[in-house]
Amino acid sequence: MEKNFYNIDEQRRWNEDYMWEREGHEWSEVFGGTENLWNKEIFPYVKEFRNKNILEIAPGRGRITQFLSVLASELTVIDLNPTCIEITKNKLGSHVKNYIVNDGKSLTGVYNNSMDLVISWDSFVHMHKNVIEEYIKEIYRVLSPGGKSFIHHSWFQQGSEYSTNNVAGRSNMTPELFTELINNYGMKVVHQFNVSFPEVTDTITIFQK
């Protein structure tokens, strides 16, 4: 039976209950490890933001954060789970400028027009559409003019041929619907492509303010 993470309370409970024995690196195995994931699936699309202000939403235990902290001039991380923030801070310390605990749908504590890049990996795939829309509204607020966002989200429609493959708690979202939400806030998609896992297909959407 699939597990639904996209309710904020459920996501909070899951974060508290999950053992994190491998610090999230188990989810990188399909890419040949976390370093390969970064080098092949993420870095080519964010390397232009070297020495820029970057915000990461839902860093977990810092799996991707470790690379972003080297790339960015100033890195801010924001997460629903205080334990994740604490552990990431213990790992990376002053290499991350700001550590923020949020409510799972807003970017309170991040200034308007202050970020050149907003990025999230492995979290939006579990979020309900309404939560994603709240985040998109907030991403628009914090991005600097011309700034970009790199979001890994699900490509799953309940009741479609893909629904039988939803064994990873994917929320109902499609590239088309994600694009519509972005356009509603005056932003535009600059690149969109799929990432295939053994059991599901997800989408990366890169959009610009």
Where are these regions (language model features)?
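Class I (Rossmann-like) S-adenosyl-L-methionine-dependent methyltransferase catalytic domain
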Residues: 1-50, 57-108, 127-134, 148-209
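Structural signature of beta-strand start/N-cap positions in the alpha/beta core
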Residues: 53, 74, 114-116
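A short SAM/SAH-binding and catalytic strip from SAM-dependent methyltransferases
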Residues: 117-130
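A short glycine-rich, Lys/Arg-flanked "PGG" loop and its adjoining helix->strand segment in the class I
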Residues: 133-145
